C-alpha cells in the first residue's frame, strides 16, 4: 500500500484534470466522487486529503509516503523530505500586486513571508511585511498596505478587486515529494506510481 498526501483545493482540481488526460481513471474517479472523506482508497493507493501547507508535514513525519504539493509551500521553509519531481500541472506564479496607481511600497501583505522578504531584499527595497492567512487582496483594497505578494493563476481575483499585477516574482508548479525512508523501503511502489503518472525522474 502506498499512502499519498494530496493538497486540497486548486491543486487537487488540477491533478484530477491531469489524471483524466492520461486516463488514470481509477484514481481520478475516486478523487472526484469523494464527499467529505479525507481518507480514500483505490487499488493499492491510499489518499489523504489535507491543507496544502500540511502535505510536507505528513510526508516528513512518515504518515504519507508521497506528497503532491505546490512548490510555493516548499519554498517557504525547509522540510526533511525528498523534493523529487516537477509535475506537469498546477502552474501559476508569485507576483507583487497593487492598485494601478501604486509605485512605491512600504507595507506588503502576504501569506508567504519568506518569499516576499527574499524578493524585496533582492531588489534593495525595505518593506514592512504583514502576514495574513487569507484574502490578502482585501488588505490592499482598504489601504492597510501598499501592495501584496500572492499566487496568481488567471488574475481574475486581482481584477475583481481593482488590483493589477506589478511584478512577476517566480514560477510555481506542483511537486512530488517523498518521505526519505519510504523512498528506499517502497522504491518499487513509488517508481510504479511515478510511471503511472507518465512523468520521469528526468523532470526533477
UniProtKB/Swiss-Prot annotation:
Entry keyword annotation includes Nucleotide-binding: yes
GO biological process: L-histidine biosynthetic process
Broad class of where this protein is predominantly found: cytoplasm
Pathway per the UniProt entry: Amino-acid biosynthesis; L-histidine biosynthesis; L-histidine from 5-phospho-alpha-D-ribose 1-diphosphate: step 1/9
Catalytic activity: 1-(5-phospho-beta-D-ribosyl)-ATP + diphosphate = 5-phospho-alpha-D-ribose 1-diphosphate + ATP
Highest taxon, organism lineage: Bacteria
Subunit structure: Heteromultimer composed of HisG and HisZ subunits.
Family statement drawn from the similarity comment of this UniProt entry: Belongs to the ATP phosphoribosyltransferase family. Short subfamily.
UniProt-recorded name of the protein: ATP phosphoribosyltransferase
Organism of provenance: Staphylococcus aureus (strain MRSA252)
Lineage: Bacteria, Bacillati, Bacillota, Bacilli, Bacillales
Amino acid at each position: 500500500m502506498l499512502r499519498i498526501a494530496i493538497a486540497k483545493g486548486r491543486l487537487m482540481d488540477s491533478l484530477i484534470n491531469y489524471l483524466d488526460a492520461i486516463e488514470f481513471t481509477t484514481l481520478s474517479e475516486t478523487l472526484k466522487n469523494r464527499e467529505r472523506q479525507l481518507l480514500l482508497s483505490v487499488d493499492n493507493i491510499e489518499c489523504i486529503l489535507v491543507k496544502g501547507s500540511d502535505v510536507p508535514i505528513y510526508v516528513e513525519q512518515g504518515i504519507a509516503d508521497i506528497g503532491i504539493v505546490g512548490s510555493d509551500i516548499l519554498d517557504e521553509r525547509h522540510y526533511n523530505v525528498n523534493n523529487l519531481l516537477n509535475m506537469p500541472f498546477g502552474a501559476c506564479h508569485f507576483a507583487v500586486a497593487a492598485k494601478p496607481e501604486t509605485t512605491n511600497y512600504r507595507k506588503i501583505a502576504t501569506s508567504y513571508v519568506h518569499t516576499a522578504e527574499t524578493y524585496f531584499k533582492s531588489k534593495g527595497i525595505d518593506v514592512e511585511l504583514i502576514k495574513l492567512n487569507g484574502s490578502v487582496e482585501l488588505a490592499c483594497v482598504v489601504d492597510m498596505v501598499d501592495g501584496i505578494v500572492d499566487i496568481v493563476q488567471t488574475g481574475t481575483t486581482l481584477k475583481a478587486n481593482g488590483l493589477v499585477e506589478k511584478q512577476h516574482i517566480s514560477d510555481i508548479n506542483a511537486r512530488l515529494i517523498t518521505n526519505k525512508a519510504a523512498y528506499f523501503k517502497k522504491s518499487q511502489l513509488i517508481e510504479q506510481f511515478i510511471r503511472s503518472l507518465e512523468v520521469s525522474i528526468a523532470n526533477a
